Amino acid sequence: MLIDKCTLFLRAGNGGNGVISWRKEAHYPEGGPWGGDGGKGGDVYIIGDHNLNSLIDLRYKKKIEAEDGENGKTKLATGKNGNDIYIKVPVGTTITNSITNEVIVDILVTGQKYLICKGGMGGKGNAYFKSSKNRIPNLCENGELGETIEAQFELKYIADVGLLGLPNAGKSTLVNSLSNTNLKTANYMFTTLSPSLGVVNFEDEHLVFADIPGIIEDASNGSGLGLDFLKHIERCHFLIHLISVANIDTENPFKDYLTIVEELKKYNKEILKRKIFIVLNKIDENDSKDNINLFLKEFKKISNKKVYQISGFFKENTNELLKDIFKDYKKHKEQWERELEEKINSYSLVKVEKEQEDIVTYEKDENRIWVVSSKRIAYWFNRIPFNTDENVTRFMQKIKMDEIEQTLKDKGAKIGDSFRIQDVMFEIN
């Protein structure tokens, strides 16, 4: 079964909380702060694995979460870091943000590693805050929250050569014949229900061929299985457009050719700019000659491309086709390898966050209470516990409480009026 798309909620581990603790030992009368820091939360990584060929291992999971860091302890003990999570995916998997549809990363080679959710840093214990001005700090921090994302995983098979054509064009038979694989074949619609890959060897070189199934008229609009599988064409360097000339398969092979071309145009016309080998198949059929002549006559009116005539089943004339495919591949190999390396390098191992201006919003809730919020305020609300007066004072400094209160006054609020940050009420001074 082909499982090539799924959506998962991913969460990195939260950082552990720092603690407030005091040294109380008979031989150390000075005492002092002794609270340790929290451990770092685990990261979530994506890693390419060429041994996988579908997303079935992820299909039935709703979420994947890394381990939280442990809280700090007394005696300056730092909490244990949370374990990282490594999600293995097949090579060819594209991961997008399911909310924004932004592509996050393309996994293009085995071993490629990408940090998709970063674990939160551990919070500081009170020992961290000791200074010449504050020798007994009653301060601590909670750990940072781990990053989260709802991500869509979509597998687009990576192949050097993709075989296109209507059902019964003989794509699976040709891949079987050239690669000595054993794909299911028969003379009925949609024999192949998922992209099938075969390695074709020729003159000490090898290329991966993919049989792309399900393309019929209106495939680009979702008819048949076409829309699900057209996407696999996008990664192929070359395409073979296979057209059956057997009477049992077609009334007009040129019309069959145009059907596929129109579907490619509607799906993504850029695909037509790639090298496409036009191949008439099943020339071994006794009734094929008239269809061959009909196709060649009509095709010459629109193109001067070379048309190959083969029998995939009997391997007739296939060497000529392979010779030209491998020759063209060698011409472009270095360029494609360079482009692949550049693309992989464009996905840095550690994401670079886009800095955004922090905008503070002031809105009234259903009870006419002012609600103040921003990313910075939410961050420090989560980081600083309100368990000591010093922590509360530090929170107010971090969010610039004086500026918030002045803005509320400018909006008509008065001294003594209440306002809310997250779930905590404050009064304007």
Curated annotation (Swiss-Prot):
Keywords recorded for this protein, A-Z: Cytoplasm, GTP-binding, Hydrolase, Magnesium, Metal-binding, Nucleotide-binding
Domain OCT: 351-429
Known cofactor(s): Mg(2+)
Location of this chain's protein in the cell: Cytoplasm
GO CC, one annotated term: cytoplasm
Enzyme Commission code(s) on record: 3.6.5.-
Primary location group: cytoplasm
Domain Obg: 1-158
Chain sites annotated for binding GTP: 165-172, 190-194, 211-214, 281-284, 311-313
Pfam families: DUF1967, GTP1_OBG, MMR_HSR1
Family matches, as Gene3D superfamilies: GTP-binding protein OBG, C-terminal domain (3.30.300.350), GTP1/OBG domain (2.70.210.12), P-loop containing nucleotide triphosphate hydrolases (3.40.50.300)
GO biological process, one term: ribosome biogenesis
InterPro entries (UniProt xref): G_OBG, GTP-bd, GTP-bd_Obg/CgtA, GTP-bd_prot_GTP1/OBG_C_sf, GTP1_OBG_dom, GTP1_OBG_dom_sf, OBG_GTPase, OCT_dom
OBG-type G domain location: 159-330
Residues involved in Mg(2+) binding: 172, 192
GO molecular function terms attached to this record: GTP binding; GTPase activity; magnesium ion binding
Family: Belongs to the TRAFAC class OBG-HflX-like GTPase superfamily. OBG GTPase family.
Role this protein plays: An essential GTPase which binds GTP, GDP and possibly (p)ppGpp with moderate affinity, with high nucleotide exchange rates and a fairly low GTP hydrolysis rate. Plays a role in control of the cell cycle, stress response, ribosome biogenesis and in those bacteria that undergo differentiation, in morphogenesis control.
Subunit structure, as described in the record: Monomer.
PANTHER family: DEVELOPMENTALLY REGULATED GTP-BINDING PROTEIN-RELATED, MITOCHONDRIAL RIBOSOME-ASSOCIATED GTPASE 2
Protein name: GTPase Obg
Gene: obg
